[in-house]
């Protein structure tokens, strides 16, 4: 398989893109989060779950490498002269893990996409971005908006939600999670100047008492849950994810907020990343925390996210064990997740010293 794959360095790929960009398909085999932080312009992210990888047993089908049917059809029809595979920094394809994304993608392309020449990018994205930064798209991390755009607070923000006028917990402004998804507090949601500066077209209000200040200007989705251990936020995951996707598909941007932008709204953003990108909770948590450092979903919400993870990543697991939000997900086997997260809700215990639980939390979601 390796003998069928050519090698390009950064200069070679630059020349290829300059001559035949429309006939060159770039497949980035890094994680979703690495790809989102920066990638070669026009490249496509290749990713699949560990369950799919395990089932493949070293022979991944092209439908998993290029899941977009139209793109895959063009590839099989010979519309692409070259397909270039890359990871973060590998110097040679033969050094890639046999069950890794890069090797599995190369194998599938060599077996099924015979009309195109397959290449491996030596040095990966790291080398190419250093040599040709103008051909790469990068997201600044964290990306936020500074607070003092104006000192006035709308009249509508002075009642119904006390935090709107006292953002003492805020560290900076709203943050970009994805190009179409932003996270922040009720105070940010009361600042039309901030929302307009970010290009926001819709808001998800994850609270029972914070008002929707500008219903004549933006589309709103209300999720009336409290930030406590009794609240079932997972039953709203599907609706929230569908709403975000509908705004994204319409070319809009969604701002998700609760009162403080710490627990409820962060939980919705985490669920969105986990479901749409099939990543584990700890990966999604680290990704969001890098952008808004004060996030801290309460202990119950973390448990609901873990249940969500077990069913998102394990398609054989019994969906009946999860919340209503999981009814349409695949089923799979259970997984064990170990992580360290701060939690902000009091934990009821006979020992009063344990008024707040600090991890590590070890959880084995069960089917």
Swiss-Prot record:
GO terms for molecular function: growth factor binding; MAP kinase tyrosine/serine/threonine phosphatase activity; mitogen-activated protein kinase binding; phosphoprotein phosphatase activity; protein serine/threonine phosphatase activity; protein tyrosine phosphatase activity; protein tyrosine/serine/threonine phosphatase activity. It catalyses: O-phospho-L-tyrosyl-[protein] + H2O = L-tyrosyl-[protein] + phosphate; O-phospho-L-seryl-[protein] + H2O = L-seryl-[protein] + phosphate; O-phospho-L-threonyl-[protein] + H2O = L-threonyl-[protein] + phosphate. Induction: By oxidative stress and heat shock. The keyword Protein biosynthesis does not apply. Phosphorylation at Ser-359 and Ser-364 by MAPK1/ERK2 and MAPK3/ERK1 reduces its rate of degradation. 'Lys-48'-linked polyubiquitinated by NEURL3, leading to proteasomal degradation. The keyword Transmembrane helix does not apply. Gene3D superfamilies: Protein tyrosine phosphatase superfamily, Rhodanese-like domain. The active site is at residue 258. Residues 173-314 form the Tyrosine-protein phosphatase domain. It is found in: Nucleus. Changing residue 258 to S: Loss of phosphatase activity. One of its GO terms (biological process) is negative regulation of apoptotic process. CDD domains: DSP_DUSP1 (cd14638), DSP_MapKP (cd01446). It holds the Pfam family DSPc. Residues 20-137 form the Rhodanese domain. One of its GO terms (cellular component) is cytoplasm. SUPFAM superfamilies: (Phosphotyrosine protein) phosphatases II, Rhodanese/Cell cycle control phosphatase. Keywords: Cell cycle, Hydrolase, Nucleus, Phosphoprotein, Protein phosphatase, Stress response, Ubl conjugation. Expressed at high levels in the lung, liver placenta and pancreas. Moderate levels seen in the heart and skeletal muscle. Lower levels found in the brain and kidney. It is an enzyme of class 3 (hydrolase). Its EC number is 3.1.3.16, 3.1.3.48. Belongs to the protein-tyrosine phosphatase family. Non-receptor class dual specificity subfamily. Dual specificity phosphatase that dephosphorylates MAP kinase MAPK1/ERK2 on both 'Thr-183' and 'Tyr-185', regulating its activity during the meiotic cell cycle. This is Dual specificity protein phosphatase 1. It comes from Homo sapiens.
